[in-house]
Amino acid sequence: MPRRREVPKREVLPDPKFASQDVSKFINVIMQSGKKSVAERIVYGAFDHITAKASKDPLEVFAAAVANVKPVVEVKSRRVGGANYQVPVEVRPSRRMALSMRWLREAARKRAEKSMAQRLAGELLEAAEGRGAAMKKREEVHRMAEANKAFSHYRF
């Protein structure tokens, strides 16, 4: 922990198309090597695919997907007397958002569709319905926390 004053979080500018900070954050998560225009094309392309495939509002699907994938608890390693314990801890809200977006990105990258936009659209639609690889990851993290509930008294 730093001993100086706490540095304030920077506000993320909302994206130009949907005026949403969450979409803007997601574009930043998708971005590789600073290529923001490519990331925007992927995310907006995925939203177009969602509109075409499911004829639903892409923002609602995106919000539902992120909300469904958000983890409530995770495990952190804690060393106590020569043994490492996986201690379940609650996830703070900002980290929940970051983890869910990261898991959606990774799940989309592992899919088999042709373009990244199609893969992302497929993963977002599945996550919004409570299915998909990102949801599987969330359940896995929750299962780990449940299995290690006995060590919760070692909280940080």
From Swiss-Prot:
CDD domains xrefs: uS7_Bacteria (cd14869)
Keyword list, A-Z: Ribonucleoprotein, Ribosomal protein, RNA-binding, rRNA-binding, tRNA-binding
GO cellular component, one term: small ribosomal subunit
Protein biosynthesis is among the record's keywords: no
One MF annotation (Gene Ontology) recorded for this entry: tRNA binding
Pfam families registered for this protein in UniProt: Ribosomal_S7
SUPFAM superfamilies: Ribosomal protein S7 (SSF47973)
Disulfide bonds, paired cysteine numbers: none
PANTHER family: RIBOSOMAL PROTEIN S7
General function of this protein: One of the primary rRNA binding proteins, it binds directly to 16S rRNA where it nucleates assembly of the head domain of the 30S subunit. Is located at the subunit interface close to the decoding center, probably blocks exit of the E-site tRNA.
HAMAP family cross-referenced by the UniProt entry: Ribosomal_uS7_B (MF_00480_B)
Protein name: Small ribosomal subunit protein uS7
Species of provenance: Azoarcus sp. (strain BH72)
